[in-house]
A protein has these predicted regions:
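C-terminal catalytic "cap/lid" subdomain
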Residues: 1-148
Length: 148
């Protein structure tokens, strides 16, 4: 029921031309929801899915999702299926926030399962938004299912 209410509220805002900015740490935090979302990455994926967004871009301080390959980690450009091993590669928190890569991977799973295109991209890149949608930078997570 809460998800449906959230979805309806978002839809009404979008129809009015309002782009809602939601931060779990501020406007929607209530004691009853502690642990419900985890952090803003996961909350953004839930909101993108509820709003039937086409895209979710997570802007961060790294170029995307890296995996170890010997001396130098490899940037994955496209991740079609997330595995438990991929999530295990992620630990710790980012320098600019509390979620770290693990929460971004969880958000990618939620978004892609909800039919939303998702990318993790370095927000300091001059063309971060346009180039991530064009898949020139970052890590892209295609939707795993089509929305009805």
């Amino acid at each position: 029921m809460r998800y449906k209410n959230l979805q309806n509220a978002l839809q009404q805002l979008l129809e009015l031309g309002v782009v809602p900015i939601v931060n779990e740490n501020d406007s929607v935090w209530v004691p009853e929801l502690v642990g419900a979302f985890g952090d803003n990455d996961e909350l953004s994926a839930l909101l993108a899915t509820a709003a039937h967004a086409d895209w979710l871009l997570l802007l961060t301080e790294v170029d995307g999702f890296y995996v170890p390959t010997g001396k130098h980690p490899k940037l994955l450009r496209t991740v079609r299926k997330l595995t438990p091993q991929m999530e295990e590669l992620c630990n710790g928190h980012g320098q600019l926030g509390t979620g770290g890569m693990r929460s971004k991977i969880r958000a990618a799973k939620t978004a892609s399962e909800g039919g939303v295109h998702m990318a993790i991209v370095n927000g300091r890149h001059a063309h971060a938004i346009l180039w991530s949608i064009a898949r020139k930078i970052g890590t892209y997570f295609p939707p795993r299912r089509r929305r009805s």
